[in-house]
């Protein structure tokens, strides 16, 4: 489901983590350089484990951004109320009056009109969404590379609302691995093999092979129905709609000469591993790397991933009823903010925070589970890494 935009969803500008006392002395770091910072991103005590989820203790954080053309001429309160609707207008009025929102380091009146290129800072109590409690298992470790089994629901690196509840953040808290350079991405709900370089030189080595088309990758998926026994190659363009957060596939050969095909070229090879008549296990080898490529190409074949919340709806008459049945059967779990209300013994409650005393951020309520798509192998010139199959990969 879609959530109202929070500042956490804004990747523009600069951000820094701070404490209430050290707010003026903490080091500023660019979002792009966050992975390469020598300071600790996370520590073990940052996490709370409850109800099958890994939560992050809320912490103070300062967002820094610069006034762009669209913002210029707005009052400071209108800017935040219009651009970041995840908090009510009254909150922003209070934040400006109290100095939690500043312009060029100065407290300004609520009627202040912002000007181009001014620096705006917002000091707030940050709550991150929870992730599934599964460990980040180290599969293979060398001086210049480490491979892990990424659990579903955990982003690879800091982005959007996630910072500490990421693979990079969890590894920083639980293992002394130093600087980390993830060399490829997996969607948040996808699990499996993740390769992480430990030196810039090794990261560049992998990058050159990936960009040169020298790397092969393989996933497994659990799909609806009896997948064809013969190998199937899907060659269909993928068009990603950022506002909807989903992709569509279109076959260039069936579009007609007078119709322009949307999206980018994409190709995936599928091979059936097993079937029980209701579901099939399928080996998936993406030749290209488009957004949601495997998921949308499987939907295109008529055999979508059997628990895919985005691409299953066209193949289930009543998706809400289907999900409800799986919840009743214990196959899915609902995470709701109302399930997690804590006291000051668990974390410091901020009187101005719109999330406290709840642990989960406002607007977060999802049917969060492991998507039945798992990366099992990456191989290139002179190297190969694998990841064991997940528990759902049986029929």
UniProtKB/Swiss-Prot annotation:
Q: Which positions are catalytic residues?
A: 187
Q: Which UniProt keywords apply?
A: Isomerase, RNA-binding
Keyword Isomerase applies = yes
Q: Which GO terms describe its biological process?
A: pseudouridine synthesis
One Pfam short name: PseudoU_synth_2
InterPro entries, A to Z: PsdUridine_synth_cat_dom_sf (IPR020103), PsdUridine_synth_RluA-like_CS (IPR006224), PsdUridine_synth_RluC/D (IPR006225), PsdUridine_synth_RsuA/RluA (IPR006145), RluA_PseudoU_synthase (IPR050188)
Q: Give the matching NCBIfam families.
A: rluA_subfam
Sequence similarity: Belongs to the pseudouridine synthase RluA family.
Name listed for the protein in its UniProt record: RNA pseudouridine synthase 7
Q: Which organism is it from?
A: Arabidopsis thaliana
Q: What are the top taxonomic ranks of the organism?
A: Eukaryota, Viridiplantae, Streptophyta, Embryophyta, Tracheophyta
């Amino acid at each position: 489901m879609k959530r109202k935009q929070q500042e956490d969803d804004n990747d523009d500008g600069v951000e820094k983590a701070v404490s209430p006392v050290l707010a003026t002395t903490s080091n500023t770091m660019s979002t792009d350089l966050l992975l390469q910072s020598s300071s600790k991103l996370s520590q073990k005590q940052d996490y709370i484990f409850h109800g099958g989820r890994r939560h992050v203790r809320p912490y103070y954080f300062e967002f820094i951004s610069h006034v762009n053309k669209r913002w210029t001429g707005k009052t400071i309160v209108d800017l935040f109320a219009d651009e970041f609707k995840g908090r009510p207008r009254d909150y922003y009025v209070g934040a400006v009056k109290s100095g939690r929102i500043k312009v060029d380091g100065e407290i300004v009146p609520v009627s202040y009109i912002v000007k181009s290129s001014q620096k705006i800072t917002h000091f707030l109590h940050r709550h991150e969404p929870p992730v599934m409690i599964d460990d980040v298992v180290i599969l293979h470790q060398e001086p210049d590379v480490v491979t892990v089994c990424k659990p579903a629901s955990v982003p690879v690196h800091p982005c959007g609302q996630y910072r500490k509840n990421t693979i990079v953040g969890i590894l920083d808290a639980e293992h002394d691995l130093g600087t980390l350079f993830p060399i490829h991405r997996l969607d948040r709900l996808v699990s499996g093999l993740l390769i992480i370089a430990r030196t810039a030189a090794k990261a560049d080595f992998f990058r050159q092979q990936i960009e040169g088309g020298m790397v092969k990758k393989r996933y497994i998926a659990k799909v609806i129905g009896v997948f064809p026994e013969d190998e199937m190659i899907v060659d269909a363009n993928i068009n990603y709609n950022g506002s909807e957060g989903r992709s569509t596939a279109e076959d260039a050969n069936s579009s007609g000469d007078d119709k322009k095909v949307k999206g980018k070229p994409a190709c995936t090879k599928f091979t059936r591993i097993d079937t029980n008549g209701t579901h099939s296990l399928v080996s998936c080898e993406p030749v290209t790397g488009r957004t949601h490529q495997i998921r949308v190409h499987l939907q295109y074949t008529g055999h979508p991933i059997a628990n895919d919340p985005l691409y299953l709806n066209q193949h289930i008459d009543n998706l809400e009823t289907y999900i409800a049945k799986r919840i009743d059967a214990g196959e899915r779990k609902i995470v709701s903010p109302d399930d997690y209300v804590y006291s000051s013994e668990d974390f410091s409650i901020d009187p101005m925070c719109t999330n406290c005393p709840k642990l989960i951020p406002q607007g977060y309520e999802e049917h969060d589970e492991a998507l039945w798509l798992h990366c099992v192998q990456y191989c290139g010139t002179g190297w190969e890494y694998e990841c064991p199959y997940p528990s759902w990969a049986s029929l």
